[in-house]
Regions:
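Conserved NTP-donor binding/palm subdomain of two-metal-ion nucleotidyltransferases/polymerases, i.e.
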Residues: 1-113, 119-263
């Protein structure tokens, strides 16, 4: 492994483990490349301590502050949207986002993008779409076989956010047995969401075993179409560590065997 990547991974590891013994001294000739690598993978907060007293520090500190601000903005958008749905009798399941960020030592350091919600009942999905559009959520046309995309703009701030409203947890596979297994696992009759409290608000989320199976498929889809970076791997590892005792690994292996992807 190149020294640059070795140093980068040391920063990631020490930050996620809260290892204060790691000195994090960065050779001057690596500073520009390491800063660019962290920016590319949206992991600037994890390497920030190593750039103290360098010319890169002010800009990287500002990016870290922006990322933390974005976390609370997404948190507010998530709460706003889920509250709207639940107050109108529409159950939904929070995927990824602040739910996964809660597994990090510092949740605000996990880069957040759009909001992903899963509604697995067709009638509830239809009701949600009518409600959202009536409340100012604008549908954005997108080719997708598993979600509908909406943009919502807060009038007071002018800040807009994207909502991906999922009717399937992941996109369709060409291999039909895989689609059948995924549909069965996350069907209304089989799936039993659990509750997770984040920043004082309680959401419905996937149970640990189903969550891990979902993350495997999510990573596989990224790998097949565009590849995935270290953030997805960090999500996976931190979630496993947090919920290890609650995950039925034998069941996950069984599901993978059913779809002919046990090698995943």
């Amino acid at each position: 492994m190149q020294p640059l990547y070795d140093h980068y991974l040391q920063f990631i590891r020490s930050s996620l483990k809260n290892d204060t013994s790691f000195s994090g001294a960065i050779p001057e000739e690596e500073q520009a490349s390491l800063a660019a690598l962290a920016e590319e993978h949206r992991t600037v907060p994890f390497v920030l301590p190593g750039f103290r007293n360098t010319s890169f520090y002010p800009a990287m500190l500002q990016k870290t502050k922006n990322m933390m601000l974005n976390y609370y903005q997404i948190d507010a958008f998530t709460r706003h949207t889920v509250s709207l749905l639940e107050e109108n009798g529409i159950p939904c399941i929070l995927l990824k986002g602040i739910s996964l960020a809660a597994c990090y030592p510092v949740p605000e350091y996990r880069k957040l993008g759009d909001l992903d919600l899963y509604i697995n009942e067709p009638k509830a999905l239809e009701k949600a779409q009518v409600l959202l559009e009536a409340q100012g959520y604008k549908e954005e046309k997108e080719l997708s076989d598993h979600h509908v995309t909406y943009r919502y703009t807060f009038q007071k701030t002018g800040r807009s956010f994207l909502l991906e409203l999922h009717y399937r947890v992941v996109g369709m596979y060409q291999y039909e047995p895989a689609n059948q297994t995924v549909d069965e696992v996350y069907s209304p009759l089989r799936l039993k969401p659990i509750r997770q409290t984040i920043n004082g608000f309680t959401y419905s989320v996937l149970p640990p075993t189903e969550y891990v199976f979902y993350m495997i498929h999510h990573m596989l889809k990224h790998y097949l179409y565009s590849g995935f970076g270290i953030r997805l791997l960090c999500d996976f590892v931190l979630y496993l560590k947090r919920y290890e005792k609650e995950i039925d690994f034998s069941r996950i292996h069984q599901w993978c065997e059913e779809i002919g992807r046990a090698h995943v």
